[in-house]
Regions:
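Conserved phosphate- and dinucleotide-binding cores of soluble alpha/beta proteins
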Residues: 32-161
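Helix-turn-helix/homeodomain-like alpha-helical modules used for DNA recognition
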Residues: 1-21, 25-30
Length: 161
């Protein structure tokens, strides 16, 4: 089966809930919420990436998390985005969280980001990945076409949820 990194956030928890119970996957996550959702999926090999737990984020970060990520590779990274801008790329509000996201992105063959309209064309202080590194962008049907065109020009495949 396919291997995935899934980091934290409410959107990624919703994605985890949508994963069918009869699909064979390996999922590595630093999110306790995602781990909890997938814990009863019998065909999912679940790898929980430990480290310093940040309650506000619901994720583990820090040296232990980074060391675990360094030992793994994924076919696809479901990246939770705080901000997404065609010029600044993917950004996060927490430096430790951004560091883990960068490590996951660097060890993944592709990056998928699912965002709501309120995160499009916004930025946070810490850079995670360039817009051109996004393989798949999942957006609402009402997402502004001009913004989506900027991401398409940089190589992202656009999908409507």
């Amino acid at each position: 089966g396919q291997s995935l990194f899934i980091d934290g956030g409410t959107t990624n928890e919703a994605i985890a809930r949508a994963i069918p119970r009869d699909i064979e996957l390996t999922v590595a996550t630093n999110s306790l919420g995602v781990a909890s959702v997938l814990s009863d999926h019998p065909l999912v090999e679940l790898i929980v990436l430990g480290g310093r737990y940040v309650r506000d984020l619901g994720t583990c970060v820090g040296a232990d998390t980074l060391a675990a990520v360094a030992q793994l590779g994924a076919d696809l990274f479901f990246l939770g985005s705080c901000g997404l801008d065609a010029t600044r790329g993917v950004t996060a509000f927490d430096s430790s969280e951004a560091e883990v996201k960068r490590a996951m992105a660097g060890n993944s063959a592709g990056i998928l980001i699912a965002v709501t309209n309120d995160k499009l064309a916004t930025t946070a202080p810490y850079r995670v990945a360039a817009a051109g590194s996004i393989s798949h962008l999942v957006v609402e049907k009402t997402a502004p076409a001009a913004i989506l065109a900027d991401f398409e020009r940089q190589g992202a495949q656009i999908h409507f949820a």
